[in-house]
Amino acid sequence: DESQYAQMVAEVFQTKHHSHTVQTSAYDLIDKLVGLYDEPYADSSAIPTYRVCEMARKHVTVALSGDAGDECFIGYRRYNLFAMEERIRRLFPETLRRRVFTPLGRYYPKLDWAPRFIRGKTTFQALARESADAYLHGVSICSDEMKKSLFSKKQTSSLQGYNSRQVFDNHLAGKEFEDPLRMIQYLDYKTYLPGDILTKVDRASMGVSLEV
């Protein structure tokens, strides 16, 4: 609940602040969102986004959005983690990295309950990979191993060798980046922004006739 911080910001900048608390059981909205998005879409923040647009439409017909700020100005925590991992990658030759971090990533326990500083499984797995592959692994919900355990032989065969990594590969083909951090920013510009964030706000706002 960030409402108290929103109120503080509004007071600092002396803006007209409106606050509205919605019920957590907003399941009745899901069917409506399915119609608005008209495609498979799994970002749960579409629900509060729609509610914000709905509330804004009561006061205005056009609004400015702050979306893409984190992508443009390296605001996500995952960017900082990637930069840290990249510094470690440069310390070890690729062969040594794979030999050291692959077994660590495989056998180190997944400690979701533990303090962040001793959770290392995903980091070890990332360090065993090259930059783009490591970033894809870090932002993916389903790992390659999980997909293999879930897909039947028929499903695997129907994919005809396709791997979601190809999306990244296609965007990076022929591109060169002096800084790997710029590379993952570019990937987010090409995938995460148009495929999730911008789509979320665009469809939700159109659903209430709000121009964002």
Annotate each language-model stretch with its function.
Residues 1-162, 200-212:
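ATP-dependent adenylate-handling active sites, centered on carboxylate activation for C-N bond formation
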Residues 162-173:
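A short, charged helix-loop
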